[in-house]
UniProtKB/Swiss-Prot annotation:
Single annotated GO MF: aspartic-type endopeptidase activity
Protein name: Lipoprotein signal peptidase
Upper taxonomic lineage: Bacteria, Bacillati, Bacillota, Bacilli, Lactobacillales
PANTHER family: LIPOPROTEIN SIGNAL PEPTIDASE (PTHR33695:SF1)
Its biological purpose: This protein specifically catalyzes the removal of signal peptides from prolipoproteins.
Membrane-spanning parts: 5-25, 59-79, 82-102, 124-144
Keyword annotations of the record: Aspartyl protease, Cell membrane, Hydrolase, Membrane, Protease, Transmembrane, Transmembrane helix
Membrane among keywords: yes
Pathway connected to this protein: Protein modification; lipoprotein biosynthesis (signal peptide cleavage)
Annotated NCBIfam families: lspA
Catalytic activity: Release of signal peptides from bacterial membrane prolipoproteins. Hydrolyzes -Xaa-Yaa-Zaa-|-(S,diacylglyceryl)Cys-, in which Xaa is hydrophobic (preferably Leu), and Yaa (Ala or Ser) and Zaa (Gly or Ala) have small, neutral side chains
Any one biological process term the GO annotation gives: proteolysis
Enzyme Commission numbers on file: 3.4.23.36
Residues annotated as the enzyme's active site: D113, D129
């Protein structure tokens, strides 16, 4: 049952990510901004050929090599730790986010980013980035609370 739940979460995460990215591309000009919540959040359409804070900009080969490795390792750990809820949640979200951005990189050579925080200087990000970030936080909690790793 958990395998099916993991698959559903991954598919829903990818669909949400890809549908929203497509909406942004269709409705916002590249570089333009639409205010969503004044002084808090806006949508700014950018093409990101790197990672957060423009690290590895223009290094698509790095992501095209690294992402499948991360996915294989995450899938292996998901299989091994399926019964442990924190690992299950974290790894499932990481896989969904990694696949969402990987699909962009393979198809377009860049990732569509759109969420811009207005109240702090933070990189523009997307739904896949949110899934990855939350997944890594949950995985970190899983590792810290795992009695087997102590």
């Amino acid at each position: 049952m958990k395998k099916l739940l993991s698959l559903v979460i991954i598919v829903v995460g990818i669909i949400a990510d890809q549908v929203f990215k497509n909406w942004v591309v269709a409705n916002i000009q590249l570089g333009d901004t639409k205010k969503i919540w004044p002084d808090v959040l806006s949508l700014t359409y950018i093409k990101n050929d790197g990672a957060a804070w423009s690290s590895f900009s223009g290094q698509q080969w790095f992501f095209l090599v690294l992402t499948p490795i991360v996915l294989i390792v995450a899938l292996w750990f998901l299989w091994k730790k399926m019964g442990q809820n924190w690992y299950f949640a974290g790894l499932t979200l990481i896989i969904a986010g990694a696949l969402g951005n990987f699909m962009d990189r393979v198809r377009q050579g860049f990732v569509v980013d759109m969420f811009q925080t207005e109240f702090m200087n933070f990189p523009i990000f997307n739904i896949a980035d949110i899934l990855l970030s939350v997944g890594f936080v949950v995985l970190f909690i899983a590792i810290l609370t795992d009695k087997e790793t102590k």
